[in-house]
Amino acid sequence: MTELKLIHIFTDGSCLGNPGPGGYGIVMNYKGHTKEMSDGFALTTNNRMELLAPIVALEALKEPCKVILTSDSQYMRQGITTWIHGWKKKGWMTSNRTPVKNVDLWKRLDKAAQLHQIDWRWVKGHAGHPENERCDQLARAAAEASPTQVDEGYQPES
């Protein structure tokens, strides 16, 4: 059996206004090669962008990999490593019996994560971590670029 490739992925999400224009930024490192990705949406939330970034990164991998995925989002990290198990058992309801927010993205992240061996890591945001700072720049630039793309799953609070 061949050994899985080790990929380092760094992600960040940004939103101006929350809700408002938003974007995500991704930096992927593999054997000295770096790939950056980002995109923006006209109306979304910070949490949706924090979830979409690792989804896009994992979906971009062409084969199963060993991944070290680093984000400054405790929401994303806690959700995918801890909370998701209970949500799935309860039919995507929280412990208060309310529907899980951003369920479309949680399901997509769960599916994308199944294909890889992932070490989910957290880094403090805005603390000088080079890749995290770069992701932040990419995400903010995407949000500030007057994006017109619609975040199809975004549902405003009523």
Curated annotation (Swiss-Prot):
Organism: Shewanella sp. (strain ANA-3)
Subunit-level organization: Monomer.
Known function: Endonuclease that specifically degrades the RNA of RNA-DNA hybrids.
Catalytic EC class: hydrolase
UniProt-recorded name of the protein: Ribonuclease H
Family stated for the protein in its record: Belongs to the RNase H family.
Residues annotated as domain RNase H type-1: 3-144
Record-level Gene Ontology MF annotations: magnesium ion binding; nucleic acid binding; RNA-DNA hybrid ribonuclease activity
Disordered as annotated region, ranges: 137-158
Record field: catalytic activity: Endonucleolytic cleavage to 5'-phosphomonoester
Location of the protein in the cell: Cytoplasm
Cofactor note: Binds 1 Mg(2+) ion per subunit. May bind a second metal ion at a regulatory site, or after substrate binding.
Cofactor: Mg(2+)
PANTHER family for this protein: RIBONUCLEASE H1
Keyword DNA-binding: no
InterPro entries from the UniProt entry: RNase_H (IPR050092), RNaseH-like_sf (IPR012337), RNaseH_domain (IPR002156), RNaseH_sf (IPR036397), RNaseHI (IPR022892)
EC number: 3.1.26.4
Keywords: Cytoplasm, Endonuclease, Hydrolase, Magnesium, Metal-binding, Nuclease
GO terms, biological process: DNA replication, removal of RNA primer
